[in-house]
Amino acid sequence: MAIFYKNQGFNLTTTNATTVLSINTSSVAIVKDIAVTNTGSSPATLDMYVYDYSASTTYQFIHASVQGACNGNAAQTVLNLEEGDAILAQTPTVNVIKGVISYALLDRTGENG
């Protein structure tokens, strides 16, 4: 099993729920931090979801008002993502919410069993 430490940036350019991180079906991930910033001058609502591939269900884990011109950590705890899972983000205010997801990817490609 190989462990890769990675960062994935995102910029919410639409009001639709957007996949900001997806895990392939041969890996799992441990999300350590979701750093977000609001580059606008007014507060913006941020909703974040985990898509559970094995249950074909989406669960909301964040509903927050990100103040104008500020930074913060959206993940208040570590998230464990299984094979095929994803993180989605949504805001009604486009082009102001940006962020970086820091995670460890545990790749099981070629693993026996």
Language model segments and positions:
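Short solvent-exposed strand-capping/beta-turn motif centered on an Asx-Ser/Thr pair
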Residues: 36-41, 92
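Beta-strand signatures of extracellular beta-sandwich domains
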Residues: 47-51, 100-102
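C-terminal interaction-tip segments
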Residues: 1-29, 33, 91-113
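Intrinsically disordered, low-complexity Pro/Gly/Ser/Thr-rich segments with frequent PxxP/GP/PP motifs
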Residues: 51-86, 92
